Amino acid sequence: MSEQFLYFLQQMFNGVTLGSTYALIAIGYTMVYGIIGMINFAHGEVYMIGSYVSFMIIAALMMMGIDTSWLLVAAGFIGAIIIASAYGWSIERVAYRPVRNSKRLIALISAIGMSIFLQNYVSLTEGSRDVALPSLFNGQWIVGSSENFSASITTMQAVIWIVTFLAMLALTIFIRYSRMGRACRACAEDLKMASLLGINTDRVIALTFVIGAAMAAVAGVLLGQFYGVINPYIGFMAGMKAFTAAVLGGIGSIPGAMIGGLILGVAEALSSAYLSTEYKDVVSFALLILVLLVMPTGILGRPEVEKV
């Protein structure tokens, strides 16, 4: 294989890795918007909290002498999902339910206030400095090599791909075949009609926040291990990128969030490799603007029909 092709292949691996985590976070945005038509701008902080919870659990278990990587990560996942889900439920109860029928601006201010509160809460309790995470997966597989360059897949990248696939598969099965999943789809189609048909819409909305928070927690664990460092402010940019992915794919569409996340991740990786790392954010948001100019509802978004 040529060196140029191997370099391109490596960037594709990196882009799919990053895009997979964006897709996980984007699901929370797209599910909440699909049902109540609001954006949860505190969602990125839930991702950040998931990272911190997994770090504390893994560090505690390592101090107890447990050093099996898969066991440590599994414990981190379970703890992060439980705590982040509780935060997601609390955000819906405190920041959204009281203002659900108010003007959109009030809900937006409430969400931003919750985001700032969570950032500062973690900063005060855990400190504002970067925290280094223990590296649990250090292996790699060489896919191809030339005289000066080799393309490889790290064990952590493979873990991210597998976990993301399983999480997406579980969510798809839940939405399509479970009773609560069908209730979520009914509420996304017409919230008022679903309420008239006897569906407990408050419970469905709360469940939507919980599912989104759980997905964000999974992404928090994965990205924490991938980058090896976390701080109380990582949620803001990750949340903005995931929101961009959701809009890019068509906000309100779960497959759209998946596609948007992968496109955004690949675009960032390629721009970092062939232009400069300083341009990756510019390229990401420019791509969003370009897509919205051509397809205002995103790649898989449906145009809203005004009912009269």
Curated annotation (Swiss-Prot):
CDD domains: TM_PBP1_LivH_like. GO terms for molecular function: L-isoleucine transmembrane transporter activity; L-leucine transmembrane transporter activity; L-phenylalanine transmembrane transporter activity; L-valine transmembrane transporter activity. It is a multi-pass membrane protein. Keywords: Amino-acid transport, Cell inner membrane, Cell membrane, Membrane, Transmembrane, Transmembrane helix, Transport. One of its GO terms (cellular component) is plasma membrane. Residues 43-45, 92-104, 176-203, 267-280 are periplasmic. Pfam families: BPD_transp_2 (PF02653). It is found in: Cell inner membrane. Residues 1-21, 67-70, 126-154, 225-246, 302-308 are cytoplasmic. The chain crosses the membrane at residues 22-42, 46-66, 71-91, 105-125, 155-175, 204-224, 247-266, 281-301. It comes from the Bacteria. The keyword Transmembrane applies. GO terms for biological process: D-alanine transmembrane transport; L-alanine transport; L-isoleucine import across plasma membrane; L-leucine import across plasma membrane; L-valine transmembrane transport; phenylalanine transport. Its main location: membrane. Part of the binding-protein-dependent transport system for branched-chain amino acids. Probably responsible for the translocation of the substrates across the membrane. Belongs to the binding-protein-dependent transport system permease family. LivHM subfamily. This is High-affinity branched-chain amino acid transport system permease protein LivH. It comes from Salmonella typhimurium (strain LT2 / SGSC1412 / ATCC 700720).
